Amino acid sequence: MSFESFLLFIMVFLLVVLVIFSVFNAIFFRKNKNKYDALLAEYCQQGLDLDLITKVAFHFGHLVDYQKILWFVLLYKGVKIKYTKERYVQPEAYQFVQSLPDEKIDWILKLHRLYLIHFAIMTLWFLDLFVLFVFYK
């Protein structure tokens, strides 16, 4: 097997893995959608800051599931987020998410880790594509 054939095989293999990961992540989010909706409703009832992307993400289906959970992941990890040019997200928003019981936040953190693995595999796929393009024009 030549190096070019090996790279093509890896490219196809990674593409199949990416499709499987995408389907699995979409199913995993859909399975927990009621938990997400309840968490979002509870969060909004508190009058806490919510970014525009999270507000409109439900219109785009599973294509933006990562964006739906990212807001809560960043708050859970305590990342300083600018809400407007003048101010950061309220400290109460961080406290709310960080004080959630494990059963409400663990699935979001797990899905976030799965998306990070997904993005790492996608990076490998693009790297493989780049090598094929550069060396085998």
Regions found by a protein language model. Name each.
Residues 12-33, 59-71:
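Hydrophobic alpha-helical membrane-embedded segments
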Residues 1-13:
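Feature marks short, highly hydrophobic, charge-poor N-terminal signal-anchor/signal peptide-like helices
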Residues 38-100:
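Membrane-proximal soluble regions of multi-pass membrane proteins
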Residues 60-68, 99-123:
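Loop-to-transmembrane boundary segments
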Residues 27-28, 39, 137:
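Conserved binding-pocket/active-site segment within a compact domain
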Residues 14-19, 120-128:
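Hydrophobic cores of alpha-helical transmembrane segments in multi-pass integral membrane proteins
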Residues 126-137:
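Juxtamembrane boundary at the C-terminal end of a transmembrane helix
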